[in-house]
Every structure is written in C-alpha cells, then in structure tokens.
Amino acid sequence: MDLSKWCNLKTEPSLKHLTEAGFGVPKEKQSVPVQELVKAHIESFDQAVTDGLCRVVEAIPPMEFLYKGDRISLSFVEAIIHTPSVSKGGISRDLRVFPAECRGRRCTYRAKLVADVSWSVNGVPKGIIKQSLGQMPIMVKSKLCNLHGLSPKELLEHHEEAEEMGGYFIVNGIEKVIRLLIMPRRNYPIAVSRPKFKSRGQGYTQYAISMRCVKEEHTAINMNLHYLDNGTVMVNFIYRKELFFLPLGFALKALVDYSDYQIYQELIKGREDNSFYKSCVSEMLRIVMDQGCTTKIKVLNYLGERFRVKLNLPEWFTHEQCAHFLLDECLCIHLKTDVEKFYMLCLMTRKLFSFAKQECMEENPDSPMFHEVLTPGQLYLMFLKEKMEGWLVSVKLALEKKPQRVGGLTPDSMTKLFNMGTDLTKAFEYLLATGNLMSKTGLGMLQNSGLCVVADKLNFIRYLSHFRCVHRGAAFAKMRTTTVRKLLPESWGFLCPVHTPDGEPCGLMNHMTAHCEIVAPVYPTSTLPGLLCSLGVNAADGNPGQAYSDCYPVILDGAMIGWVEKEVAPSVIESLRRFKVLGEKKVPPWTEIVLVPQTGKASLYPGLYLFTTPCRMVRTVRNLSLGKQELIGIFEQVYLNVGIFEKEIEDGVTTHQELFPHSMLSVVAEFIPFSDHNQSPRNMYQCQMSKQTMGFPLHSYQYRSDNKLYRLQTPQSPLVRPAMYDHYDVDNYPIGTNAIVAVISYTGYDMEDAMIVNKSSWERGFAHGSVYKTEIIDLSEKVKGDDSIVFGVKPGDPKVMGKLDADGLPFIGSVLKYGDPFYGYISLNTGQSHVYFYKYQESCVVDNIKVCSNETGTGRFKRICVTSRVPRNPTIGDKFASRHGQKGILSRLWPAEDMPFTESGMSPDILFNPHGFPSRMTIGMLIESMAGKSASLHGLCHDATPFTFSEENSALEHFGELLKAAGYNYYGTERLYSGLSGLELEADIFIGVVYYQRLRHMVSDKFQVRTTGARDKVTNQPMGGRNVQGGIRFGEMERDALLAHGTSFLLHDRLFNCSDRSVAQVCMDCGSLLSPLLEKPPPNWSATRHRKTICLLCNKSDSIETVSVPYVFKYFVAELAAMNIKIKLDVK
C-alpha cells in the first residue's frame, strides 16, 4: 500500500488547467486518486481469481461414492479463469471482447472457467480431464479484464473513458456493483447477551461467545459457546443451514489426546482461585466420562456415530473419519491443527465465564470495532467454491442415473458425463443480475438479497459513491430499534458522519471516508509467532514467569499464540509497531495491534490481539514517535491517542496525528465548500443532492447505450471549491454552473424555497440539459422463428416518405414526434412490410443508431440500438440546489427588463428568498457568495476546504478585504435598482456568485394529466400510474382541503361521478343489493316480452328501486356475501 499519496495534496485550487495548450490530448497515465476509489473492489477480485482460486481448489474435498461396487473419486486439481474472448469459430479480427461491446449488445462480460478434474477408481488414478465449467462474469479493469494496464489513449480507442475506473461487472449490458456489506470481525470471540438464546433449550441463559470463523479462501461459519445455568458450556454451530449442539467436554476431548487433568489445567488458567469455575469444569468433563468416552478415540467414535447421518459422507467412512470431518468443517475452521482449536476453545470458555459472572462487559455487535467488510472478491470466491462443489454432486447424480450398461468407465464416457454437469454460468449471472443469493449453505451470511446494485451513471459523484458505500445489511432495515443506526465514536475517521441518506436507510447505508481503505492482500504470518516469542511472549504450552492472572493471552488472527506478562506487554507493542511502520521483520504494514488492558473493573476482556487478515478497514495517520505514516484499524484506534491540530498534541500522551482536519469526511462530503460553517443536516442533504445532480457523467456518449443518461449542456468549473475537488479531477465531470445570486424578496413567487430565474439567462442556455434514452429493437424477438424478417421499407411507401431511410431506420438528427414512423421491417419471403410508430408524447432527436450482430458475427443484422436525445430546458417546477442543501424549484422565468440591477447594470441570474437562511443556518453559502464574487473580480479560484478558517482567521475578514480591494462593499452587499420603477431599493442587497446544481427531478418526467382513459377491471375506478395515463390520486388530504374550503359537495363530483358511479337495484323491504335479479323466462315466452326484476328473498317486484352507488361498493358487498356476511341497506 502506498502511504505517500496524501503527501502531495494540492492546497491551492487553480483554473490553469481549463486553458491548457494540450487540452483534449490524453495523458500518459490515469489519475491515481480516482483509480484508488475502486481499489477495494478490484484488489479483492484479483486476489480471488489468482491466489484465492488456487486455495478453493485445494479446499474442495474429493467427491467419493460407490458405482457398481467400485469406489469412484472425483476431485479438482487445478482451475483457471481465462480472459473474455469470442468463440474461435466466429468471424472477427480480434478474439478479445471489450466491455464497450458488451454494453452495446446488452450481453455479459464474461470468460471461460476451465478446471482439471482428476478421477480414480478404487484409489487407482485414471487420469485428468480438462473440463469447461461455464462462463464467469469478469470485473472490469481487473487482471483478467482486457482493459487491464491500458493507457488513457488505448482506453479511448476501445470506446472507454480516459479515467475508466472499473470495479463493476457487466451483466446483460448493465453495470452492476457488488455491495460492500458489514460483517462481524472474523476469528474474534465476541461476548453477546441475547434473551432469545434462552429459547434454545432447557437451562440456556442469555450469555454466549460468538465467533465468525473464516478460512483463507473466505469460507465462513458461525460458532457460539452458550453458558447454561448449571455452569456447563454448549458449543453451537450451523452446518448446511441446520443448527447443531455439542457439549464442550466432547469437543475438547475429541481434539486432543490429553488426560482430563491436562484439559482441566488448561481451562482454569488465570482462574485458579475460582472454586465455582473449577467445579463447573469438572462437571463438564464428568459428562463425557458418564458416556464411557475415556479416550480421544472413543469420543471420536461416539461423535461420528451420531453425526454421520447429517454429513452425507461415503458409507465406507468409519465413525472416526466422520468425527474428524465434523471437527474440520464446523469447529474453529480458521485453524489448521486440532491443538490450536483446543487452545482457542479454552480461551473462549474462560471469556464466557468471565462474561457470565460480569467480570467483563458485553461487546456491542453494532460497534465498528467488531466489524469488517464483505468485499466483492470474497463473495465471488465463496459462491464459486459452493458451485464447484455442486458441480461434482451433479456429475455423481448423472452417473447414478446412467443406465447400467456392460463395461466400465472410460475417459471418453467420463468426458461425456462431465459435460452433463451443472453449468455455472446461469448461477453467477442470476446472482449479479438480481442480487439474490441462491445457496444451500447460506455462506455464513445474514441476507440473501440486495447483494448487487446498478452502478448508476447519473453523474460522476453518484457513480463513485457506489464504490465507497458500506451497507449494514438488509436484515437490520426491518428492525424497529435505532441502536444499529447510531453513529458511534469508534467510527471516527473510517465512516463518514455526514454522508448517509435521510429516511429509511439512515445510519444503515454509510460511506467510507476518503482516507479509509480495505485490506485485500493475504500475507503469510508464519514468522510472526517466532518474532513474538523473541520479544518476550511465552508459548501457549509454556509457563510464564508470573501467574496467569497477571498475564495477557496473545491472539494472532484467531489463534492462541501464548501469554505475555503485564509489564512486558507495552514493550512488545512498541516493538511490533516500529517493525510495522518501518517494514521490518516481515510484519505487514496493515497489521492491527491491540492491547486491551486490565482495568480492575468490568471492561473488555483483556488480551493482546494481532490482526493481519483481509477485509478490515484501515486508514492512514502520522506516527509522531517515528515521524512516518501508519495504517491503523478501528479496534486499534480506540487504544491510541490521535490528535487533530498541532496545539492538541501532548508529549508522552498523544501517539498519532491526523493527516488533515477533514480526515473524517467521505469523498462526497469533502466536495461541500465551507461545510464546517453549515448545520449538519444541510451537509447531509447536500451529500444526497450532489448524487441527484444533472451533470456530465461521461465523455463517450456516442458509444454508450444506457437506458437513460443525463447531460448538462453548459457546465462550469466552480470558482470556490475544496482542495479535494482538484485532487479527484472533478472538473473532468462537472456538475453545475456559477450563477449570480441576489438574496432579495422581490416578488411573491419565491416563497417556500422557490426561486426566480432571469429569463434572458435561461435563453442564453443557463442550466440547459438533455436526456439520452436508448431503445433496443430485436427483430428475432418480435417475429420469432422467421429468419427472413429484416429492417427495411417498401420503396415509395407514402407512410414513411422522407421519414425513414431505405434501411427502415430514421435519419440521424431527425426529430421524432408522437405518431411519426420510428422504424420499419420487411419480410424477404412475402414482401410484406410493417412500420412501428413513435409512441412517446415528448418529441426527441435521433442521436445515433448502432447495429449489433450475434455472437459469431454471422447472419443478417436484426438488432439495433437507437439512442434519442430529448432536450430539456429548465421549466417551471424543475428542481435546483446550491452546494449547501438549499434546494428549491424554479417558480418563474422573470423578464430581464423587470429584474433588479446593480449600479454597473448587471442583472442577477437567480433571485433567492432571504427567508431561506435563518432557519437553515447555511452560513457556508453566504461565505461562498462573497468568495465567488471576489474570485470573479480578481480572477482567482478560492480554497473552500473545511476547517481552513476559524475564529482567529475569519472568513468574513479574508473575503471582505478582497471585495474591498476590488472596490466593492466589505460585506458583499450592493445597491440595486428596481427593474419595474427604476428607483434605487432602500435596502442593501447581498449579491454574489454561487455554484448552482440542476437536479434530475424535472416536471417533464413527473407531470400527469387525464380526462378519460383506462379503468380498473375489478373496481371500475380510473387506473393509477403515469405510464398508463392514469388518474391522479385524490386522497384524504385533498378531501380535507375541499372540506376546509366549504366546498364539500365537490367531493360528490370528484369521488363519485368522476370515479366509479354505477346504477344498482335494491329491494326496499329487505335492503339487499344482491337479491334483485331479472326473472328467468319460461321457454314459451317471446324475446320481446318485458322481464321484471324480482327480489329472490321477498319474491316480489314492486319493492325494487334503482339507486346510484359506487361500483366498488357493489364489489365489496359481493365479497362480504362470499364470506357469509349480509349487508342490509336502509333505503329512504
């Protein structure tokens, strides 16, 4: 990891790059800060498909079974994922497939997974067969991607962005991102108290120690140790979504061939004086003896006999082998030897008893200290392992279904059999396309949906925030408790306190800070135990110089290494930290070193914990004692003293210092100018609104075929911006416009956050934008089974004359209106032509048309991709916002001649109502207005990084002096003249330059009007929904408004006459709406004879009356009658 990247942060923003001589020429290298934003995604995927795939192959056990009395064994030897390419039989100059082609053709960017499968009969190897297991989705810009390592110039040649970041998958032409999810910290025993544990069985208490055990290839399993009210401990684990319980004594006895006394001595370490605990340990060992399990072999046979029915192992496995399988796959699976598992279970038992007796505190499972992140590579690898195991099972089932023919198995027959195995392609595409996990084991996860989201390219800021977002999990969204949503102090510097949505996902969907990274590499730690012992740590089976109660247990990645004395521990920590920072003794730079001290009262369970595992969050700070930068973790940070400013540093107390005062903000939050002068909710709103801005999301519009893209036609570089704006080169993808804003209540059209825009500014293109919509037209789907259908029109067809070209497609640049011919196709066999007409109400311009071929590049072209451009000038009702959460809608386009003007004759672009400031307290916007004004007068670009100004160094003084030097008022006000009367306004008006954003919420997308139209078939009421031209909902609030205005009879028209008025017949005597029916005519009646309506209950017709009722009421009465409930009407 490069720790020097934050040293060269630009401090003074500049506009020089806007007038560079070499503008438009691609740079030699991509911007490192922009590429770092997706590093967690790409690094984890690279790790998964290289080293991780090898580990998966090693970890998958052989599939062994009986066939015709022979023992068949199938196992993977090697697996490799190739780079994306077309099949060799196709017509193409280059076999490589690039992401732009997959987006255009709406297909998946994928590559072939090939495995070497070894098979043997009765233990005799029969050879290795190379087998394709399917097509795997490939992450863009990863090592397997064809874009990997390309320069910006080469990326442009392949129709990508010069700053293409990657980090996503392309499934059916749509860019999908695997979400970063919060998971419990791996291989760390957490003390939890949950009342629902009591319902697990008789004697269970709420106390437990929970551990999420994770192997090197990321296979995870959750294991609990439960405390029972009789003082014994029960081990609980999940295997194939089933819950199993095992008394602790059996687990310990099965792991090591120790005597009961040796096990007893290990368990009571540090608690030798606690007689209750010693009696509990004796009782747990006595339970094992009562079952006749006196030795390790007997315990293994005992467990294997009881568990083998659930393990699905070959019938020739002995009970002992079954028990070993159980211990390997279900107990502390992150540890490789049984002795390590034994020591870890003993440590967890000691912690459980300390917790049950209130000697240590409960650990908050919602605290970031005990969290890590589920990365895309981790999920990809876990899912791949399960599906490869499933492939072996499918081959076994295919062999068992094979008819019992004479003759044995041959390499040819096995190859045919392997081809019948389950293909992995659909499973992976389903996972990425829907985000739903179809798994038999659950992969140790808390949710099986919402794992993937679309990488929405609404603008650059929204796009990058997808890769920095960390979600707590779908399971917590349904909880009524608010504890999971709270911002805890431990998250300082790792999770942004500002960048979280308001509303339902608040506090659950968080974003990593700009300095936060996720550890991806897996580093060998085999040398660390020896290093620890050389520093003064005693081995787990050794004897320290002091009593165990005066020592700390040392845990490295969930393995008990040994014990360290209290007095020696601080020096061990200091030495390890020095090795870590200086890169000595093979200590990884991302190692987390945590010493939880003994406090003499109930606190966290003391110990020396070392973490080198991947998927943890780390960030960069400055180590004051060594004068270098250091990566620290969340758990580690709690026990460090980190200062922010120089004046806060105390010698001997402060150990580290923040690199910048704004280190605790996310990338998006750092784009807010002067955010330290705003109220915090306004900064939260701005983080959301900057992701809804109509901006410039990409440069390759002509090569894209997204369903919908927005484009701001007149973007500008902000005159006032934080340092991070230039650090991430946001000027390449601008999101707004500098506007002259006057704070004045000039008309009545700017109340309640509305704003007035100068009509002449609007005519000059202020905030003008357009929407690009793409439609895929596939003739093979429209007319299935007919290969003679192609695009085209009949020559001389008057319907399409001048509208469609000879190929049946519209002209590039032509305007399409409702009812215009859109495209035509013709049958080469019959000569019959069809024309499809444009069905949308909004007119558009045909921007470009792409012709798509099939996989092999053969056959007639039947698939096109039409991109149309819809111009969107701002209209009344469109939403705008400043960068300070001050959102409002355009209420009126005011003529320039009626706008107020300054002494120099300048008219503002926007009139902002001054009532928007007092309650919102967005002082940052006032400062930006003054700063923007001084920047435009002096030709400068001001730094708006938060915490730059303070009470000693006032922003008002700084920008006021600049305004004064330019000949303007110190406080940013000016004398304005009325545009109506020409007279000078009495008050001084605050006027300046503010960067405004146009949001994507436009009236053109939302307005809805209807007179008559579609009705619901069941209720006969007008249908809802804009797409079906449905009615507008008339709800309770609208009803109350009419009542409050004293126009209650209008409700009769709105809710009855214009809704579902119908005529019904009711019996006056019995009040029934259902019983009046037309009498059934006898056969000899003529068709013209009048039939009477008779009540079936009263058997007479003179009591029938016609009434007007809502149709839905008739439906409701019929539904109640079906439930044997009678409705009686009182008709007068």
Swiss-Prot record:
Zinc finger (C4-type) residue numbers: 1067-1098
InterPro entries: DNA-dir_RNA_pol_su2, DNA-dir_RNAP_su2_dom, DNA-dir_RNAP_su2_hyb_sf, RNA_pol_bsu_CS, RNA_pol_bsu_protrusion, RNA_pol_Rpb2_2, RNA_pol_Rpb2_2_sf, RNA_pol_Rpb2_3
Ranges that cross the membrane: none
Effect of a null allele: Knockdown of the gene by morpholino antisense oligomer reduces neural crest cell migration and causes severe craniofacial defects.
Primary location: nucleus
Entry's EC annotation: 2.7.7.6
GO (cellular component) term, any one: chromosome
Subcellular location per the Swiss-Prot or TrEMBL entry: Nucleus, Nucleolus; Chromosome
Catalytic reaction equation(s): RNA(n) + a ribonucleoside 5'-triphosphate = RNA(n+1) + diphosphate
Molecular function terms from GO: DNA binding; DNA-directed RNA polymerase activity; ribonucleoside binding; zinc ion binding
Enzyme class: transferase
Coiled-coil region(s): none
UniProtKB keywords: Chromosome, DNA-directed RNA polymerase, Metal-binding, Nucleotidyltransferase, Nucleus, Phosphoprotein, Transcription, Transferase, Zinc, Zinc-finger
Subunit structure of this chain's protein: Component of the RNA polymerase I (Pol I) complex consisting of at least 13 subunits.
PANTHER family to which the protein is assigned, alphabetical: DNA-DIRECTED RNA POLYMERASE I SUBUNIT 2
UniProt record similarity statement: Belongs to the RNA polymerase beta chain family.
Function in brief: DNA-dependent RNA polymerase catalyzes the transcription of DNA into RNA using the four ribonucleoside triphosphates as substrates. Second largest core component of RNA polymerase I which synthesizes ribosomal RNA precursors. Proposed to contribute to the polymerase catalytic activity and forms the polymerase active center together with the largest subunit. Pol I is composed of mobile elements and RPA2 is part of the core element with the central large cleft and probably a clamp element that moves to open and close the cleft.
Protein name, per record: DNA-directed RNA polymerase I subunit RPA2
Protein source organism: Danio rerio
Encoding gene per record: polr1b
